[in-house]
A protein has these predicted regions:
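Short loop/edge segments at beta-strand edges and connector loops
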Residues: 41, 60-63, 106
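Residue-level detector of alpha-helix initiation sites
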Residues: 20-22, 85-86, 132
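ADP-ribose/adenylate-binding Rossmann-like module
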Residues: 77-83, 88-114
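E1/E1-like adenylate-forming module used to activate ubiquitin-like modifiers
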Residues: 102-154
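An accessory alpha-helical subdomain
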Residues: 132-215
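A short, aliphatic-rich alpha-helical micro-motif
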Residues: 9, 71-73
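Hydrophobic, well-ordered beta-alpha structural blocks that scaffold small-molecule cofactor pockets
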Residues: 1-51
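Glycine-rich, highly charged phosphate/nucleotide-binding loops
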Residues: 53-70
Length: 215
């Protein structure tokens, strides 16, 4: 499996065929990105209705027909989320004809891409996929990682500032790498996870001050 990060723009369209629970989960992720989301479905979930009433996506309250083929051709990504196999087969055939990347909820083998479960812990963004092992595994791993890495929410913003300081003080890429290997190794990382970030932060500040004094 090749994992990629898609960068969308305001001019990109992401199209959803279907309006059930799967479409809702996929749409929830896309609504956080700078793109236009369009849903074609005669029925949508209550949560999707709430988003629609807030003008967060475009809803075509109808079944998929040939009228929407041009929309498929123009979209950046296509999510096929209906419970009708014949409709899903037809929409997939159209997307294949025009080279549109698709994700099909009822057939993982037909997917050009998958949507991993994601975790945001401050500046840390983690994608999780059990490779079709089931959503339960994803949820358990997600919960474990949220607990395990919660301390990084405090540490990462400060480390970003320190990284810029070290860049200014140490021009050499190799020497900078050596600095971080020396002062932010596995033992320091484990200490951060155990809630000892203030101690590690103090040590890093001391090391940076030492470099500043020498220069």
């Amino acid at each position: 499996m090749l994992s990629l990060t898609l960068q969308t723009t305001a001019s990109d369209t992401i199209l959803f065929i279907g309006g059930g629970a799967v479409a809702e989960r996929r749409l929830a992720l896309c609504l956080q990105e700078p793109c236009q989301c369009i849903v074609i479905s005669p029925v949508i979930t209550e949560q999707m209705k709430s988003w629609y009433e807030d003008d967060r996506f475009v809803w075509h309250n109808t079944i998929f027909t040939d009228e929407y083929i041009d929309m498929v051709k123009r979209c950046k990504l296509l999510f096929i989320c209906t419970d009708n196999t014949a409709v899903n087969d037809y929409v997939e055939a159209i997307s294949r004809k025009y080279g549109v990347w698709l994700n099909r909820a009822d057939d993982a083998t037909s997917c050009d891409f998958t949507v991993p479960s994601t975790i945001d812990i401050g500046d840390l963004h983690i994608a999780i996929s059990a490779n079709n092992g089931g959503p339960r595994i994803n949820r358990l791993v997600k919960r474990d990682m949220m607990n395990r890495y919660s301390e990084l929410q405090i540490a990462i913003p400060r480390l970003k500032i320190m990284r810029e300081e070290v860049k200014l003080l140490i021009p050499s890429v190799e020497e900078r790498s050596q600095f971080w290997r020396t002062y932010l190794g596995e033992s320091e990382f484990q200490a951060i996870l155990k809630g000892q970030w203030p101690l590690i932060e103090e040590k890093l500040h001391h090391a940076i001050s030492g470099i500043r004094t020498k220069s």
